[in-house]
Amino acid sequence: MRCVPVFLILLGLIASAPSVDARPQTKDDALASFHDSAKRHLQRLVNARKCCPESPPCCHYFGRRK
């Protein structure tokens, strides 16, 4: 009988958890994700190149040091 309240609480938590999209990733999805990641990394390098000569702390933020 002591387990019933715990069981009900866990059941409520499971029911209120956000659902996960179990759809498998297609080739187009994977390619789009790869392109987004590449764009993000290139933008980070461009930003580092712009600010590093002016601000050494900026270089440290972008993972580059003088």
Curated annotation (Swiss-Prot):
Coiled-coil annotated spans: none
Molecular function via GO: toxin activity
Propeptide feature ranges: 23-48
Cellular compartments annotated: Secreted
Entry annotated with the keyword Disulfide bond: yes
Leader sequence segment: 1-22
Domain-level remarks: The cysteine framework is V (CC-CC).
Protein name per Swiss-Prot or TrEMBL: Conotoxin Ca5.2
Record organism: Conus caracteristicus (Characteristic cone)
